[in-house]
């Protein structure tokens, strides 16, 4: 058998980028979007959507594989949105990795993924998904949660929050784990370097982009996609997650006089249930905008105990309508309720409370 020697440039010439539309709750297989071909989807067997408010021809999608985005045109009458911003009938908007497309009425969330694939079937198929965990992509996310990764030790240089994860021998990532950054928790929770505590039910990791001096995530080993998937069967697990969160505060911030809150985002950006354990100083350069602030300081942040009581009484978690609108509220100090015009001014104001 003859040997074929390919240079790096030869390999890239043999590669082609492909685009996939992926349902975030994994209700159906991902849908391939061929380069520059108009694909119309909506209610039907392909999407498993039966909601009659969703047209059979709700959106037209056209992938610009070379440019790394998808043009989305709303065809149906009812609203299609990207990151909670309605597109509008017969209007066209770009959908980029890191953004969430809701098919209709803020329901049925989708993301796009790009992969590199070998053109020559004789070569071993090589796929490399376009990672969208950079800061720009995270800024676009509706909840603006950080992608957990290598994390920061309390007291370390918070400016690291703008530095991408290191690659190399020290940071192996399984091929099958690569994908949209919203799947990042599933990778991070398996990384011993990130774990600060674990037992048979849960693992605690440091948030890679902490929004305060102390910011951890408590995750169950059991795969639970979101709060909507929580049932009464998960009640003891939720209680255990809360107990572990309190334990981590004592173990790692016991000498601190900081106040903490434990809770969940109403609409999480990461596809695995996770409990935030966050100090209330919000002293972090990773806290960059209004959505970051409001995701922790409005009713968008669901208290852990309230979630437990909800499941105990109703057997499920109910998230009321209009949650994305809370992220647009004016900036208000969580300590004294004073309104502030900008994040820099809010941060300067918060310093006054640290000394009290």
UniProtKB/Swiss-Prot annotation:
Protein role: DNA-binding protein involved in single-strand DNA break repair, double-strand DNA break repair and base excision repair. Resolves abortive DNA ligation intermediates formed either at base excision sites, or when DNA ligases attempt to repair non-ligatable breaks induced by reactive oxygen species. Catalyzes the release of adenylate groups covalently linked to 5'-phosphate termini, resulting in the production of 5'-phosphate termini that can be efficiently rejoined.
Swiss-Prot/TrEMBL site (Interaction with DNA substrate) positions: 188, 265, 276, 291
EC number: 3.6.1.71, 3.6.1.72
This protein's name: Aprataxin
Provenance organism: Macaca fascicularis
Annotated region (Interactions with ADPRT/PARP1 and NCL), positions in chain: 1-110
Active site (catalytic residues): 274 (tele-amp-histidine intermediate)
InterPro entries on file: FHA_2 (IPR041388), FHA_APTX (IPR047289), Histidine_triad_CS (IPR019808), HIT-like (IPR011146), HIT-like_sf (IPR036265), SMAD_FHA_dom_sf (IPR008984), Znf-C2HE (IPR032566), Znf_C2H2_type (IPR013087)
Keyword terms: DNA damage, DNA repair, DNA-binding, Hydrolase, Metal-binding, Nucleus, Phosphoprotein, Zinc, Zinc-finger
Region (Interaction with DNA substrate) location: 207-211, 269-270
């Amino acid at each position: 058998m003859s040997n074929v020697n390919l240079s790096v440039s030869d390999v890239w010439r043999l590669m082609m980028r492909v685009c996939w539309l992926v349902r975030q709750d994994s209700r159906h297989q991902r849908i391939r979007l061929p380069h520059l071909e108009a694909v119309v989807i909506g209610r039907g067997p392909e999407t498993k959507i039966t909601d009659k408010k969703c047209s059979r021809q709700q959106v037209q999608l056209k992938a610009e594989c070379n440019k790394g985005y998808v043009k989305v045109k709303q065809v149906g009458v009812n609203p299609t949105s990207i990151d909670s911003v309605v597109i509008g009938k017969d209007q066209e908007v770009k959908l980029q990795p890191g953004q969430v497309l809701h098919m209709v009425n803020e329901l049925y969330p989708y993301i796009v993924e790009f992969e590199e694939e070998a053109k020559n079937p004789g070569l071993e198929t090589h796929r490399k998904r376009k990672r969208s965990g950079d800061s720009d992509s995270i800024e676009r996310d509706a909840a603006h949660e950080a992608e957990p990764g290598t994390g920061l030790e309390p007291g370390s240089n918070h400016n690291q929050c703008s530095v991408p994860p290191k690659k190399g021998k020290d940071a192996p990532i399984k091929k099958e784990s690569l994908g949209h950054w919203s799947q990042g928790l599933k990778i991070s929770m398996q990384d011993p370097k990130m774990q600060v505590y674990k037992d048979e039910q849960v693992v605690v990791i440091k948030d890679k982009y902490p929004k305060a001096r102390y910011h951890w995530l408590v995750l169950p080993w059991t795969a639970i996609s979101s709060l909507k998937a929580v049932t009464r069967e998960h009640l003891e697990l939720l209680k255990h997650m809360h107990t572990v969160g309190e334990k981590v505060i004592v173990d790692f911030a016991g000498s601190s006089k900081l106040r903490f809150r434990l809770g969940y985002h109403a609409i999480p950006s990461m596809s695995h249930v996770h409990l935030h354990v966050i100090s209330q100083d919000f002293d972090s350069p990773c806290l960059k905008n209004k959505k970051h602030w409001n995701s922790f300081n409005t009713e968008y942040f669901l208290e852990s105990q309230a979630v437990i009581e909800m499941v105990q009484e109703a057997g499920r978690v109910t998230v009321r309508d209009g949650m994305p609108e809370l992220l647009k509220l004016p900036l208000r100090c969580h300590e004294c309720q004073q309104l502030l015009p900008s994040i820099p001014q809010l941060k300067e104001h918060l310093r006054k409370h640290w000394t009290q």
